[in-house]
Amino acid sequence: YCEKHGFPYERIKGKGAEGRPERTTAYLNMVSRIVDENLAKLKSLPFFDENDKKKYFDLLPDSSSLKKKYSELINKGHECSERSQIEDELNKEIKAGSIDVNIMVKLDKINYDKNKEALSSEFTDAKLALKGYAESCLKSSIIFSAGINQTLFGYMSNFKDFYRDEVGDIKKKIILKVSDFRSALIQGKFLAKKGLEVYEFRIESGLNCGGHAFPSNGLLLASLLKEFKEKRSQLKEQFAPIVQKYYESKGWKYTTRENEEVLLTVQGGIGNNGERLRLMNEYGVDATGWATPFLLVPEATGIDAP
């Protein structure tokens, strides 16, 4: 991909665990650079043509204020006196999606050196992946799934990007996949003791999770979401004081932002837009996740040639 996009390429030494964080960092930085270049190309495309810029706006939901402004421009036509100003405003609002990274926390095997001696704990698979992400240039989120790994969560405290800067921004946010409210509280409190804040709880039912079942108490998604809706305020109330205490112990400034709330999202088993709207309106979730056929993407998985 470096060759394809004309980027300089330097081979990273080391096999297996050696060099893995550096390779992960280099890969993520490359993806970010490709996205930035493609975004710039998209912005440079003309309006009123059948191109990727039109496709970008067409894919936005009808409720989007950006799509409404775009539709106004198209309806006014080429000769619109405000065309240049509106086009500039629209181009400024075109943004790329977040390049998020997922770690299945239980996939954390111990690695060995060439003499078959076990490497120290910071060289386990999940920690190497975390280090690679933490040292990348990305401003995005890391998603932890498949359970809780306390040593991995504790390892995050080595990287400043997971903490607030002086204006209250967090460069690398934390998303936790959880199966119930109790799990959200337990994991959220553990992270809070390290000064780490959960940006989003991604709720997934063990009975209806779109492709893989896992052990649970057998509660249907509606029951899980009802509890989150009723107890949502507890998430901020219980975590924030613990986080602030950690910052004080480090002598760091803790800058808050207006209207800060932990996001609640849900994924799995959503079949149509009506179901999405019901989940958002009835249970107050901030977003929904739909299945993607990632196993058919050559860059994501090894697949047989047709």
Locate each region found by the language model.
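Long, compositionally biased, glycine/small-hydrophobic-enriched stretches that function as flexible linkers
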Residues: 1-153
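General structural signal for secondary-structure boundaries
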Residues: 1-5, 149, 156-161, 293, ...
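Short, mixed-charge, low-aromatic patches
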Residues: 82-87, 141-144, 191-197, 232-235
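Short, composition-biased local secondary-structure segments
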Residues: 96-103, 152-163, 233-250
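Gly-rich Lys/Arg/Thr-decorated short loops/hinges at beta-loop-alpha junctions or inter-strand turns
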Residues: 104-115, 136-138, 168-169, 213-228
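Short, basic, glycine/proline-bearing loop/turn elements
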Residues: 112-116, 170-175, 261-263
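Extended, well-ordered protein cores
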Residues: 122-176, 187-194, 204-206, 211
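Glycine-rich phosphate/ribose-binding loops and adjacent secondary-structure elements
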Residues: 176-186, 192-306
